[in-house]
Design a protein with these regions (language model features):
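Short, glycine/charged-enriched secondary-structure capping and boundary segments
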Residues: 18, 63-67, 127-129
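Extracytoplasmic/secreted cell-surface and envelope-processing proteins
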Residues: 11-13, 58-63, 122-124, 140-142
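Short loop/turn segments at strand-loop or loop-helix junctions that form parts
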Residues: 5-7, 48-64, 132-137
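Active-site-proximal C-terminal subdomain of hydrolase catalytic domains
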Residues: 110-204
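Short, well-ordered alpha-helical microsegments
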Residues: 34-37, 57-59, 101, 120-124
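A domain-level signal for caspase-like cysteine endopeptidase catalytic cores
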Residues: 1-52, 72, 76-80, 113-115, ...
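A short, glycine/acidic-enriched catalytic loop
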Residues: 56-108
Length: 204
């Protein structure tokens, strides 16, 4: 499995999905700078692709943007942090996966899992098939954007359950078309999870 998961503190818990899977190749940060088009082209058609992070209907961001950056004064001496701060002020996300990559993704015959906000709309626009999330909360601030008031602790605990469940389903080679129903069943059996995330998956 090829895993496209740009490093971000808000989404790091999602590593639980693939942490114990065999034959997982996680894309290194340098590919996001160079562009992942060549990597997608070199990936065998039969290999599944898992995509996780922040994004919208246009594609996947390299990192969360337009938010509070946790930096110390010493970080301002680092050109990388200065560039990140500038990007945050501009409010323009750096998209690392977009419609240009749709052709290479379509080669994988629907064996794609996309977990980011509006991933399902991105898939529909680009005629992709697989398992995609519609809305997804990585933390309480994400939920607030959709009018839901909650706590980070609650979202993280709920997502950990979701990630473990999804990871087991993928490792067991459960068909993607059956996963939305199984995630919903898992949510119905647990009153302590955020049902919206569990119910946000659609198979296209």
């Amino acid at each position: 499995m090829l895993v496209i998961h740009p490093k971000d503190k808000s989404t790091s818990l999602a590593e639980t999905i693939y942490a114990n899977m065999p034959n997982v190749h996680v894309v290194e940060d340098e590919w996001y700078k160079r562009g992942i088009g060549q990597l997608l082209w070199q990936t065998p058609k039969e290999e599944p692709i898992l995509i996780i992070g922040y994004g919208d209907c246009r594609g996947l961001y390299r990192e969360r943007f337009n938010d509070v950056l946790e930096i110390s004064p010493s970080d301002l001496d680092n050109p990388v942090w200065v560039q990140r701060l500038a990007n945050c002020q501009i409010g323009t996300p750096q998209i690392v996966l977009n419609r240009i990559h749709a052709y290479n993704l379509r080669r994988h015959n629907g064996n794609i899992i996309g977990i980011w906000p509006n991933a399902v709309e991105f898939a529909r626009r680009n005629r992709l098939h697989g398992l995609f999330a519609s809305t997804f909360f990585f933390n309480a601030k994400d939920a607030e954007n959709y009018g839901e008031i909650t706590l980070d602790m609650y979202i993280e605990r709920s997502n950990y359950t979701l990630y473990r469940t999804l990871g087991k389903l993928l490792a067991s080679h459960v068909p993607l078309c059956k996963i939305p129903e199984k995630l919903q069943q898992r949510a119905y059996n647990d009153t302590c999870v955020n049902h919206r995330n569990f119910e946000s998956f659609f198979c296209l």
